[in-house]
């Protein structure tokens, strides 16, 4: 009787152990599947982030989709950060994947969202400003007839202002806007991109004499122009004012873009597909034109290493783009050196990005580059400003 009871106990014990092993094996299998799934998702998001970061090295002509990849960089970056938090909390053995992903494109992250110590402007530095003035916002008139835009410019304290969408003849400027503005920035010149009477000129206001100008490149509506500014005896600063190709989105397409970003499921399928395809097509075509314009500007700078340059303007491209990267190959990005944060410069629609940029030759030291939001809603852009002071001699 005792033997039977003992045998039963041993059998029950073996049965219980087998059941526990099966349950443990089942749990292990589920965890392994879960871990591999997390790893796969993390690797996919990291791959997208890296492709987006690398897209700046490829000319968009023939590969327009890569321009879109660059535009999506912040979304992919957010995805990798989310995977980092997720793996830290629930799957720590896979946390190395998003960490490696972030380290692998840390330079691109710095270009997009730089973090720098404060750099107050020293005495005898030059203040530069680049501003897409949207035709000077003529609907906003002051009591004396001057636009609020021109009042803002005259009070900005800038020594040199590069304005885009700023067609304005010197004669009209002096006659219409009074002595105070002329005393502040007594020199002004414009290069027309569209043609006589067009509203998309490139204008420079300066405290120093403008001794020359020429068009560097242009399309039907956009381009870049060189202005030679005499900042001292025998010291010429070559300022290239850029307004690279716009995306030419209609009001309906801009609305569709907002829907794509905020509420992608709200539109009817066929209508949404048509609008989205139109946006993709226009963006891809304009990205190619911007790349060509950036190539022209960068090539001109590279051909004249003995000259001092400032290149600035409305690039219509984010920091992760071929056009911005092309200029950064020959000049220093002022915002990356001394700016902080995303630096949103376009203040309409769903676009929370920096598309206005400012570059200087290596002999200039940059101070306090920032996006000036005090301009309010005078334009659909905020201006980008910085101070510069020469700290090295030009190469012979």
Predicted segments with their positions:
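Metal-dependent phosphoester-hydrolase catalytic domains
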Residues: 3-14, 31-88, 96-100, 212-215, ...
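Active-site-proximal beta-strand elements of phosphoester/diester hydrolases
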Residues: 125-137, 236-245, 273-283
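Residue-level marker for buried hydrophobic side chains located in beta-strands
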Residues: 128-129, 162, 311
């Amino acid at each position: 009787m005792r033997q039977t009871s003992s045998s039963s106990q041993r059998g029950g014990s073996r049965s219980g152990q087998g059941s526990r092993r099966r349950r443990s094996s089942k749990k292990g299998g589920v965890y392994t599947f879960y871990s591999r799934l997390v790893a796969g998702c993390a690797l996919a998001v990291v791959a997208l982030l890296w492709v987006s970061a690398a897209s700046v090295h490829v000319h968009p002509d023939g590969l327009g989709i890569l321009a879109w990849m660059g535009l999506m960089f912040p979304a992919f970056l957010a995805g990798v950060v989310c995977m980092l938090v997720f793996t830290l909390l629930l799957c720590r053995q896979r946390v190395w994947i998003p960490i490696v992903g972030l380290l692998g494109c840390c330079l691109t992250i710095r270009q997009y969202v730089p973090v720098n110590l404060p750099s107050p402007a020293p005495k005898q530095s030059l203040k530069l400003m680049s501003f897409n003035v949207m035709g000077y916002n003529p609907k906003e008139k002051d009591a004396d007839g001057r636009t609020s835009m021109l009042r803002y410019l005259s009070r900005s304290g800038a020594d040199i202002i590069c304005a885009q969408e700023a067609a304005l003849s010197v004669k009209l400027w002096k006659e219409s806007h009074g002595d105070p503005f002329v005393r502040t920035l007594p020199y002004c010149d414009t290069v027309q991109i569209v043609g006589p009477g067009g509203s998309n000129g490139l204008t420079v206001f300066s405290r120093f004499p403008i001794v020359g100008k020429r068009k560097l490149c242009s399309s039907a509506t956009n381009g870049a122009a060189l202005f030679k500014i005499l900042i001292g005896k025998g010291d010429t600063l070559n300022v290239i004012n850029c307004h690279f190709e716009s995306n030419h989105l209609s009001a309906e397409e801009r609305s569709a873009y907002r829907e794509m970003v905020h509420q992608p499921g709200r539109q009817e399928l066929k209508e949404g597909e048509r609008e989205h395809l139109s946006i993709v097509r226009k963006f891809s075509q304009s990205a190619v034109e911007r790349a060509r314009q950036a190539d022209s500007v960068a090539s001109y700078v590279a051909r004249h290493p003995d000259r001092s340059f400032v290149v600035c303007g409305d690039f219509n491209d984010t920091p992760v783009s071929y056009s911005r990267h092309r200029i950064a190959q020959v000049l220093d990005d002022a915002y990356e050196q001394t700016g902080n944060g995303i630096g949103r410069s376009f203040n309409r629609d769903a676009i929370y990005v920096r598309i206005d940029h400012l570059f200087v030759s290596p002999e200039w030291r940059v101070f306090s580059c920032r996006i000036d939001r005090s301009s309010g809603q005078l334009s659909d852009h905020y201006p980008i400003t910085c101070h510069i002071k020469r700290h090295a001699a030009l190469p012979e």
